[in-house]
């Protein structure tokens, strides 16, 4: 009897130790799983964000090509990259000179820009945005927009917009020649930035406001469907109206609430894009994450802009090319375009400054005396641009043969945790039965 009790006690002790070990492992794994899955809301330092934005600026500035700037789409991409790179603090002196020389090559004697016609919509008003981008670059380059290449570009911009009928600003499927939805916001910021010098500012601004209301719904912008991307490409440029017009504020607040509730995965910290095969399903997306940083930084949502920054730099940063961001694991200049916007917008938000495309801080401020800046170290961030890559990247279904990291919804750790927990429970029950005295 004593031997039986002794053996029972030993077995009890053995099973008890095993159970404790397994329980400890389960707790550790569950903690790890929760840490990996939870959004990282910790705010990075301004220096950290600026370092990342300047790396991406260097990557894009070294690939800048102004040879085909008469194309409206190319003009947009090259102008945006230059503006954001300047805002990041990266030394863009050579790029600024090359850009302005390229613009002069397509400028007529009256200051108008000789832009190529769009093959599908030859009467498109998208070229309005080319003047807007140029004005923003001129401000950042410390050039006099009222006397650039012997032309007053502010007056020219004012006259073009003032002469345009309201319908030119309201894009729709039935009005495809109007200013594209993605161009409306940048025109608005150029108008706001130069409002003191535009004699028809009030009437032009009213046209833009009517257009914004006309293209908006409670979900935001319907352009080939609804998405966070669409909402960022429009509403991130209207913070000025948001703060000065209660009607626009209510409109944008509604859109921001819908955007967060629909496209933000608060469990995994990802920002999602609708699946092309099933619009009710959403997949984590690189560009959406980058643009989320820009949208939430503009509207001072520090928690979500921090999450977007952390997710972007953790999951989508190139492991081989400094400054580049990836699209399905491969370096993509187009994802990097959006990433630079998100990074610089967040950088400026942390600095207490407005959207990077708003140059009112320059055009409406008395400039201090020019002082020499210390030379910035230059680094050779180069990569090969894939010429076949299209700006209109199709979003693949992430559910098909696409490995996911724990932060984007990998459930393997959770499954392991459940299995180990069940094993531990079984051992505890068995141990209890062995040691239970017989009646």
Where are these regions (language model features)?
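An alpha-helical repeat/solenoid feature that recognizes helix-turn-helix modules
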Residues: 67-92, 116-146, 169-201, 217-251, ...
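Intrinsically disordered, low-complexity repeat and linker tracts
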Residues: 1-11, 22-28, 34-53, 351-425, ...
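Long, well-ordered core segments of solenoidal/helical folds
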Residues: 48-68, 94-119, 148-174, 199-223, ...
């Amino acid at each position: 009897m004593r031997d039986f009790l002794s053996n029972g006690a030993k077995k009890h002790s053995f099973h008890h130790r095993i159970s404790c070990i397994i329980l400890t492992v389960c707790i550790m794994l569950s903690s790890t799983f929760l840490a990996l899955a939870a959004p990282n809301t910790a705010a990075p330092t301004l220096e950290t964000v600026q370092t990342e934005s300047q790396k991406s600026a260097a990557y894009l500035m070294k690939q800048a090509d102004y040879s085909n700037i008469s194309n409206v789409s190319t003009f947009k991409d090259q102008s945006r990259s230059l503006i954001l790179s300047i805002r990041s603090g990266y030394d863009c002196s050579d790029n600024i000179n090359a850009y302005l020389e390229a613009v002069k090559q397509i400028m007529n004697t009256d200051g108008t820009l000789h832009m190529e016609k769009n093959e599908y919509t030859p009467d498109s008003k998208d070229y309005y945005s080319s003047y807007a981008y140029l004005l923003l670059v001129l401000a950042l380059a410390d050039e006099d927009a009222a006397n650039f290449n012997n032309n007053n570009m502010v007056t020219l911009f004012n006259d073009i917009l003032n002469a345009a009928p309201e319908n030119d600003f309201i894009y729709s499927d039935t009005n495809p020649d109007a200013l594209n939805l993605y161009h409306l916001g940048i025109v608005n910021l150029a108008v706001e930035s130069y409002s003191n010098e535009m004699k028809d500012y009030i009437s032009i601004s009213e046209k833009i406001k009517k257009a914004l209301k006309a293209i908006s719904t409670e979900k935001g912008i319907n352009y080939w469907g609804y998405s966070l991307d669409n909402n960022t490409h429009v509403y991130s440029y209207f913070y000025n109206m948001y703060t000065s017009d209660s009607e626009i504020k209510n409109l944008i607040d509604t859109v921001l609430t819908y955007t967060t509730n629909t496209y933000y995965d608060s469990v995994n910290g990802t920002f999602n894009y609708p699946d092309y095969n099933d619009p009710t399903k959403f997949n984590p997306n690189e560009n959406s994450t980058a643009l989320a940083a820009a949208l939430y930084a503009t509207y001072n949502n520090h928690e979500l802009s921090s999450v977007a920054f952390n997710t972007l730099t953790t999951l989508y940063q190139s492991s081989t090319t400094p400054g580049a961001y990836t699209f399905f694991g491969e370096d993509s200049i187009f994802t990097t375009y959006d990433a630079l916007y998100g990074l610089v917008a967040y950088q400026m938000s942390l600095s207490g400054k407005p959207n990077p495309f708003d140059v009112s801080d320059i055009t409406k401020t008395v400039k201090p005396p020019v002082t020499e800046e210390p030379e910035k170290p230059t680094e050779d961030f180069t990569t090969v641009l894939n010429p076949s890559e299209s700006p209109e990247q199709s979003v693949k279904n992430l559910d098909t043969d696409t490995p996911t990291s724990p932060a984007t919804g990998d459930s393997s750790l959770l499954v392991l945790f459940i299995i180990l927990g069940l094993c531990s429970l079984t051992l505890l029950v068995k141990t209890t039965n062995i040691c239970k005295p017989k009646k």
